[in-house]
Amino acid sequence: MAAKNKNKNKKVSSPKTAGKKDLVSVITTFYNAQIFILNAVNSVMQQIHTDAFDIEYVIVDDKSPDNSRAILEKFLEKSPNENNIKVKLVEPEENLGCGGARKFGIENATGNYLMFLDADDYYIKRDFVKRAYEEIVNEQADIVEFGMIFNQPNGQQVNSCVQQKMIVEDTTMAEILLFKDNAIKFNVWTKIYRKDLCDKFEYSTERIFEDVRTIPVWVSLAKKIVIMPSCEVNYRAAGGSIIRDDVLKTRLGTISGIASLFERFKNDRRVLKAMYGRAMVDLTALLDGHSSNNPGFNQMNQLNTYMLKYIYPDSYQTVTYNVENDPTASPYREE
């Protein structure tokens, strides 16, 4: 069976060099994050570890123009590092954007496991990294997924996690859980990864929606994924984010990111259909309340056509958007 809802008690060895402790690298990138960055950094610096592994904290200053770095350096200088976290503050030669900065962080990480945390989010519990490490080692998994608490701007909180532990050892099922059921999230920061898995496909350097172009590929490369029924990351929907300010651009970016993966998964029709279903959720939401004169409307239809061609390559006819002055006319025509 592809997905199992039971625990396995088998203990296994991790992919470390004989005689050496494992190292978990946590990566945070920041840009104009002076308001929240200490919450994120402190939540990592408070993480406990064991004799089996150490924690390396790679913090990437993506040429932030505000006081984030000064605030961070003052905190690191005055705060006792009681847990002996190995802090590495690095800076690229130029601003790279979200995707490029994360890739830069990965390149500077020396751990054999990777975790990520955005500068405006934080880990809820002090033993999260420890439990994530133990889970990925004991299950001999490539990826372990955890849930999150989504803090909305209006103060409401939404918990997002599965009800019971799931073990997925089938690539197609994993992709369906990602695109259709949302049990596996597109975001990069609710997971722990084996570094050697991530090395097989470079993190996207896109400035936004880079995770949509990366996570599905990492999921497809994983032989075993574990999904845990616990919320471990506090996700803050903060105003001013380059992603959250424009819903239209956000959904278009998600759809475009999904479409960019169709070539990779073109030989698995079930995965393609799951991907298309996920994209259609965003398409439907975009169409609702937007007129056909919206600049993004034609782009949406072109993406829809592009995806359908992959799913039904032998039978699908080219469709283009065609609304004229008659509002009752069909918006589509066959060519």
Mark where each language-model region is.
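Active-site activation/catalytic loop segments of kinase-like enzymes and analogous catalytic loops
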Residues: 60, 283-292
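Nucleotide-sugar donor-binding/catalytic module of glycosyltransferases
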Residues: 2, 9-255, 334
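Catalytic core of nucleotide-sugar-dependent glycosyltransferases
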Residues: 232-238, 244-273, 293-313
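Amphipathic alpha-helical repeat scaffolds of TPR domains
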Residues: 274-286
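Generic secondary-structure transition motif, activating predominantly at the C-termini of alpha-helices
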Residues: 76, 80, 137, 181-182, ...
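Long, charge-rich low-complexity segments
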Residues: 261-277, 323-335
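Short glycine/serine- and small hydrophobic-enriched flexible loop segments
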Residues: 220, 260-263, 285-288
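Membrane-interface aromatic/basic loop that binds lipid-linked glycans or pyrophosphate carriers
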Residues: 1-4, 8-18, 290-335
